[in-house]
Amino acid sequence: IAENLKLGFLVKQPEEPWFQTEWKFADKAGKDLGFEVIKIAVPDGEKTLNAIDSLAASGAKGFVICTPDPKLGSAIAAKARGYDMKVIAVDDQFVNAKGKPMDTVPLVMMAATKIGERQGQELYKEMQKRGWDVKETAVMAITADELDTARRRTTGSMDALKAAGFPEKQIYKVPTKSNDIPGAFDAANSMLVQHPEVKHWLVVGMNDNTVLGGVRATEGQGFKAPDVIGIGINGVDAVSELSK
């Protein structure tokens, strides 16, 4: 009897609905096509390399991974080669020691730039709908440029705002230490104190949580809801936040 094909699916943040959805449909594909999916959480480098060892021990022939750190790419690819396992990167592209994308590893990701552009276009539309004076308005762009997909989204958003006619000199970028609400909140606070002249804020971020962190920071600095527009990317965390 042919033994059942096993494939791993490793994700960096299993608690995030995005990755839960990926796992759910991987399981569905496994049922439909007749293979077993071994799901493992890999929040850091050590757990990632250990997970590849345990996949090999269980007889898996390959794995899909959203790595906790793109710079682990060379180590992941080398380990996979050592076990003669196939590897596909999902969402975040591997980079080599020099920080250059590893094109040798197949990548499946969404159109991050296009999604970012849509965020920027909708922010501009909503600003016009509210009749804000552009001179009193600024963009707070909470960035995580070391993560390729995040950089594509926020750059796409800022490019779309500029293309619509928003002045580049009023787009302020601030890096976040982490892509969650506390990280974005701290980043946004550090920016808000530098620009007391701004009366209206457009908040750009790579996901719902970075945008929520930015919005909460404006709230803490006394801005009211009519003077802040934030558009998240994901449609998950913002939904639960707004239902409170």
Model-identified regions with their sequence ranges:
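A residue-level marker of the well-folded mature domains of exported/periplasmic proteins
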Residues: 1-244
